[in-house]
Amino acid sequence: MQSNKDHSWSGKDNEFPTFPIGIMRVLAAAEKNGYDGEIYDINNLRHTDEEILNNLNKVKPDLVGLSGPLSHCYPNLKRIIKIIRENYPKAWIVVGGHISGSSHILLHKTETDIVVVGDGEIAFNKLLDYIKLNPDRCEKKFDELKKIEGLAYFDENNKIKMTGFGQQIKGTDMEYPSYDKWQKGLNDFGSGGELIHEVFEEADDFRNIFGLNLEKQHYTPELLKIHSELKGKKVGRIQTSKGCVAKCTFCQRATKGYRVFGQNHMEARIIELKEKYNVGVLLVDDENFGSNRNQGYECARLMKKHGIYWSSQGARAKSISVDDLKFYKDNNMLAIRYGIESGSQTILDIMEKKTTTHDVYEQLETCKRIGVATTSEAFMLGYPGESRKTALETAKYNAQLRYLLGNNWNTAYPAWATSIPGTPL
């Protein structure tokens, strides 16, 4: 793995800094309800146990909310929870994020008090209201707790009680959290609030403007010209929707359905990123961009209106038409990434992808023809039902896609299928 020490805020060898979007949304919702809190970005700062304790002592928390996006966060969550409980025995410890698919493990193996399951904005606010009236974590009022949708905890019989999934905010009411609170936390707990600017990658680096691995196909005169225009600019990220229209059996989803952000909120965020953080390119971090065609078109119009180039980091081949791609290209789209997963229709059907190898080939062929950058590197091997025959079908298909795009046909970077807790797989 490439060392990223130059990008490490702590001076240690860690990945590029990332946006703690989920927990910022939850805190923003709590603040609208009259509560206050701090963002301590342990993930990016990568602090030692001693540093974590020193920073906790600055706040002396009554409640600590921890976000675990996926199951790989468990070892660090366990470590941090131990520090909190040993030093703040009266503090409530609440865990949320996709790792809530392993609520039983968190509750049995750590000192977690409550797990928020599913969307957290409403459930966490209701939990705060409960704790305000019942501050003692050791004397829970179970008749009241069970009224809150989206919680998992030990009940009066020491059995795990789950109250369903958290109530969702309507799509048009979803807002983008301010980075100001995050910046304050970086200043208070790290080595300076200006660290926030490191999250925005440099557009001077050609690969950053796509969010894809660089390939021969990307070095076109048009894209090189656009890259020269973006020198000195930053690359940011934005979501235009939450959720997906499909139910692939390998995918961990803690939110039901598919919701899109209101256009007024989206435009305000684009303007903020451009004017405050010098962003010239946005990577659209949707699981499933474009399934709501009207919203996808409006997003593209807003990007062009404000002079922003953009790339879609996740889309379904079945959801995007040729006309859609042409429209997006005309409105500043640079690249799009499709979930391909397999070159075997047998495996795609087992995954319940609801798409075909022909759908993907047609999309990549259109991208090549009209000049939208894309990638063929989104394959998964080792799925239940995988055989020598299906693996060879995937290898052949990948070679066909790479040849189609003008890349080296004999290289590939597949991932292993992973059975993440909370998924059918």
Task: Describe the function of each predicted region.
Residues R85-K90, M303-I308, I370-G371, Y403-N407:
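Short helix-capping segments at alpha-helix termini
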Residues M1-R269, K274-N278:
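Acidic, low-complexity intrinsically disordered segments
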Residues T18, K181-S376, L381-Y383, K396:
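Radical SAM [4Fe-4S] cluster-binding motif and immediate context
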Residues L106-K126, D330-I336, Y397-P414:
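Structural recognition of alpha->loop->beta junctions
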Residues G164-G166, M174-E175, G296, D324-L325, ...:
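Short aromatic-enriched loop/helix-cap "lid" or pocket-rim segments at secondary-structure transitions
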Residues K5-S8, S102-I105, E156, A246, ...:
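Flexible glycine/acidic-rich beta-alpha junction loops that bind and position SAM and/or redox cofactors
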Residues H104-T110, D324, G385-Q400:
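Catalytic cores of alpha/beta
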